[in-house]
Regions:
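Substrate-gripping "pore-loop 1 plus following alpha2 helix"
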Residues: 1-3
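Accessory helical-bundle/CTD segments and flexible terminal tails appended to RecA-like ATPase motors
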Residues: 6-160
Length: 160
């Protein structure tokens, strides 16, 4: 959205009217349409409704537990330890995964993740989610500084 919006906004600033050509496999996509027409408010409204229906921020808190290691089986064993240490999911907290990250191997490290979402109506400031993932880390008895390494990302900017 940002690049299309920026290109469309810069086109035709001078005396000569500009034109932006967008090549896409999905030209009817609302994101492309709103960006090309410089409809920031409409795009914002669509995204906000979509995030609300999926329970993504700003309507929830998210934490990503990512394991990275050079040996695939160690990463898998560690993520299974974390998963098995979860006895019961608290009300309002949802678990996604475990699963391999979008890029399973990055810089000679295998990567797996578990994502937890906490609904703000049950957890207004995120403390329930924080206590929950801290207890998981303690109960799973994983050494967070060894191979594989555990990375905790609270409200990640990307889930890839």
């Amino acid at each position: 959205f940002q690049l299309i919006y920026q290109s469309a906004g810069r086109s035709g600033r001078g005396k000569i009217p500009g034109e932006v050509v967008i090549q896409s496999y999905n030209p009817d996509n609302t994101v492309i349409d709103h960006a090309a027409k410089l409809e920031l408010k409409k795009y914002y409204d669509v995204c906000l409704k979509e995030r609300e229906s999926l329970d993504y921020p700003p309507f929830s808190w998210i934490v990503k537990l990512e394991l990275r290691g050079t040996k695939k089986h160690q990463v898998e064993n560690s993520i299974n330890k974390i998963t098995n240490s979860i006895k019961q999911m608290p009300k309002g907290i949802e678990k996604l995964g475990p699963a391999y990250c979008y890029r399973e191997k990055l810089k000679d490290n295998y990567r797996m993740q578990i994502i937890f979402k906490s609904q703000k109506k049950y957890d207004p400031v995120g403390t329930r989610l924080q206590k929950f993932y801290n207890s998981i880390i303690m109960n799973s008895k994983i050494n967070v500084s060894k191979n594989p390494r555990l990375i905790v990302d609270v409200n990640p900017t990307s889930l890839l």
